[in-house]
Regions:
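Hydrophobic positions on the alpha1 helix immediately C-terminal to the Walker A/P-loop
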Residues: 567
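Hydrophobic alpha-helical transmembrane segments
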Residues: 46-61
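Extended, folded cores of ATP/NTP-driven motor/assembly subunits in large transport
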Residues: 57-61, 65, 73-78, 89, ...
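Short, charged cytosolic
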Residues: 1-11
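The conserved Walker
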Residues: 548, 560
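Conserved lysine of the Walker
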Residues: 564
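P-loop NTPase motor domains
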Residues: 141, 147-151, 157-166, 171-192, ...
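Hydrophobic anchor at the beta1->P-loop junction of P-loop NTPases
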Residues: 556
């Protein structure tokens, strides 16, 4: 069941009014319009008449009115205009991959003086504009320990974390995890910026191939291993859609030096790792090379260029870390998309307009059919500042209500009739204030960015449209960043550095609803891991080594015809192909013989008329792990006698003592000379019991007689079948009801003797 939480309205839309129900910005702009427009009117009127003067005044004042009134995504007109001019005219649009080391050519002698002058002027105008693909990547230096110097005084670090079980839990357990996630979001103070990166990136085909590789063993089954590996590869491509999920948490702060930054970041890192582990989330801090590898994958989405990097090569080659991760080129020549190498991309932001959201919203956003990157930049607002801001908003709303009531009185209609938005904003603001003051909530400023990619423009637009439909179903909007594609994409790199000023104020509980967890992935990277299928929640492969789990046992259940036997046979085959383990099959329906024989195993048919014999008294020195094989064998023989005697009565102490006394006697000859001919059989035990003087010995011997001299003497023979093969199947279909339980017990014991 989905868990819903309410989302407060965006109170940043409520502006503080000063005079005439106008904001400070509007008063300044209207004042400037009047100061410039009115003198222009009188000046032009003298020479061109009132009509021309009026037109002139209107043309002069309209831009100021637009600056005062127009706003998009919380950004005023002059900011939007600045972004347009920079993207269209000042910043370099095409940026090729170009190294700038000691081996690079510093000057092209064929350049003319005019070309040099034009280039110089362009560089002067675009002082901060990157000229190459490397310069476009917005960080200064990456250190070995994972700390990145992003700007002169800003440093960041990154933690990688994995999924955990969530979607299939009960509602109360989900609510507890949501509370823990909300508390985790409050871990960062207002001086720390943090960024969640949820990436669906193309799988590393070589790495996936190595993970699913099955080494050959020259045991006659290598052809099956090749087929099995091919099957695994096909399942991996269809199940994961060729994508791999990478989840990162990056955090950064201002510091005067690297030493100060390292001390602060390591302290935060320890708190973050401890908190995540308490939530049963696997997390690890990644080093500089791993951060570079992740960025390389982001910057090379769609191509198969491998990341090859060595810290020692930096000094030898004169290159920088950016030279190892940069794409072949960047092209930011369009306002609503960009090109990275041969692939296209588009950055959008999530406009959260819904009144409530459920805990599966992020999962649905991330359930992509193509590569995409979702990023949440979060900045905590100081509690006192947040309360002050909300109180000011409530004051503005109350002032607006008073103005509306005055209008109602003048207009002669009911003063209780208020605009819907005004009433809703007022309720939400008071609710938010109460949450901040009484419910231990914090106010967070969130920037939610999503990068879609495609090999062609059409594919890109299809991917964006598909995501937009999902977003609209949640009563939210996916809005493309206009003329901020570069800043948007660079903000999605795991550097905890946000260049987009579009923010949404949310409480910790409403931010926590964007919880990423679904179900813990089970993918053991050991040679003994076996393919079990596809997780129906995560749609990922389940490849597990059961011996590494806390409870390695398994039970296959299902209705008739659902494939229980098929699944069992599949796992048996996988065990033989991928591990060194032995397989022992107890077959009550005689259905596994063809498979066992095909895999080179041994089938043993056990019944009253069979000539395949198993001696229940077989023993060897490996029978017990504690160097007491006879003691363990005695326990087995006593269990066998309890089944032979039948009924609800168990053997008493006297009967146990009789059997325990006889067992060492029948094994003396074998231990003196351990050859198969000296191994005792049930008849030897029967004869030894008859030698005992107690009355109860006679009872034990009489019960055993049926299995020694009677019609059920199938187990009174020495073993004549090969039990050393890796796969042994015991066919007990025709064993009969009288021997069924005894046969099952003996089969269980054989696994100790034959190994």
């Amino acid at each position: 069941m989905k868990i819903y939480t309410s989302v407060p309205r965006d109170l940043t839309r409520v502006k503080e009014k000063l005079l005439f129900n106008l904001t400070k910005r509007q008063i300044v702009c209207f004042g400037l319009a009047a100061v410039i427009g009115l003198p222009s009117y009188f000046f032009v009127k003298k020479s061109a008449g009132p009509t021309a003067a009026t037109l002139c005044m209107v043309f002069i004042m309209i831009p100021m009115f637009l600056v005062a009134m127009y706003e998009k995504n919380g950004q005023p007109l002059e900011v939007l205009f600045k972004q347009f001019v920079q993207a269209k005219y000042l910043r370099t649009k095409e940026r090729p991959y170009k190294t700038n080391n000691r081996f690079a050519v510093k000057k092209n002698p064929s350049d003319s003086g005019k070309e040099n002058f034009i280039r110089h002027m362009k560089n002067k105008l675009s002082k901060d504009s990157p000229q190459t693909a490397q310069q476009s990547i917005p960080y200064r230096k990456m250190y070995r320990d994972g700390i990145c110097k992003v700007t002169d005084n800003y440093y960041s670090k990154t933690i990688q974390f994995k999924d955990r079980n969530y979607q299939l839990l009960k509602d109360k357990e989900k609510e507890m995890i949501l509370d823990d996630w909300g508390s985790f979001l409050k871990l960062f103070g207002n001086s720390v910026e943090f960024e969640f990166s949820f990436m669906s990136l193309p799988e590393d085909k070589d790495l996936t191939k190595n993970k699913l590789h099955i080494p050959i063993r020259f045991d006659g089954l290598d052809k099956l291993r090749e087929e099995h590996a091919k099957m695994l590869k096909e399942h991996a491509e269809t199940a994961n859609k060729g994508l791999e999920d990478v989840w990162l948490l990056s955090f950064g702060l201002e510091a005067k030096s690297l030493k100060e930054a390292k001390m602060k970041l390591e302290h935060i890192e320890k708190e973050v790792l401890d908190s995540l582990r308490k939530m049963q989330v696997d997390a690890v801090s990644i080093c500089g090379a791993e951060r570079l590898k992740v960025m390389h994958r982001m910057l090379h989405i769609g191509d198969e260029k491998r990341f090859i990097f060595d810290w020692g090569s930096l000094h030898r080659s004169g290159l920088t870390t950016k030279d190892y991760i940069a794409p072949t080129s960047f092209k930011f020549d369009e306002g609503r998309s960009f090109q990275m190498g041969a692939n296209f991309g588009a950055v959008s932001y999530l406009s959260i307009t819904a009144s409530e959201l459920n805990d599966e919203v992020l999962k649905e956003f991330l359930d992509a059919e193509s590569s995409q990157i979702a990023t949440m930049h979060i900045q905590t607002v100081d509690k006192a500042t947040a309360i002050k801001m909300v109180k000011r908003t409530i004051t503005e709303i109350d002032r607006s209500k008073i103005e509306e009531q005055k209008k109602a009185v003048k207009g002669g209609y009911d003063m209780d009739i208020m605009p819907t938005d005004l009433s809703t904003y007022g309720k939400d603001a008071r609710k938010l204030l109460n949450a901040l003051q009484s419910e231990d909530e914090s106010l967070l400023l969130v920037t939610f960015l999503i990068v879609n990619t495609g090999r062609t423009k059409n594919e890109l637009e299809e991917n964006v449209s598909r995501l937009r439909r999902i977003v609209q179903q949640k009563d939210c909007e996916l809005c493309r960043l206009d003329y901020q594609q570069e800043q948007g994409f660079m903000s999605c790199l795991p550097l905890a550095h946000n260049q987009i000023e579009i923010q949404r104020a949310l409480t910790t509980s409403s931010t926590a609803i964007f919880i990423p967890f679904t179900a813990q992935e089970i993918f053991h990277e050991s040679g003994a891991a076996i393919y079990y299928g596809v997780d129906q929640v995560t749609k990922k492969l389940i490849i597990a080594d059961r011996k590494r789990l806390k409870a390695p046992n398994a039970l296959i259940v299902g209705s008739s015809g659902s494939g229980k036997s098929f699944k069992t046979k599949e796992e048996m085959t996988s065990v033989l192909l991928m591990t060194n383990d032995d397989v022992i099959v107890c077959d009550p329906e005689a259905e596994y013989r063809p498979l066992v024989e095909k895999l080179g195993g041994q089938v043993i048919r056990i019944c009253a008329t069979s000539h395949d014999y198993i001696n229940p008294l077989d023993i060897n020195m490996n029978y017990s792990e504690e160097d007491e094989p006879l003691a363990l064998k005695a326990e087995f023989i006593m269990s066998l006698f309890e089944l032979i005697l039948g009924g609800s009565e168990k053997m008493d102490a006297e009967e146990r003592s009789i059997i325990d006394r006889c067992i060492p006697e029948i094994y003396k000859k074998y231990f003196a000379e351990p050859i198969p001919e000296n191994m005792p059989v049930l008849e030897d035990l029967y004869n030894q019991i008859l030698k005992q003087k107690e009355e109860k010995a006679k009872r034990l011997a009489t019960a055993l007689e049926l299995y020694v001299k009677g019609s059920l003497k199938v187990f009174n023979h020495r073993t004549n079948v090969d039990l050393k093969k890796r796969m042994v199947c015991f066919d007990i279909k025709d064993l009969g009801n009288q021997l069924k339980k005894i046969g099952m017990l003996i089969v269980q014991d054989v696994r100790f003797v034959s190994r």
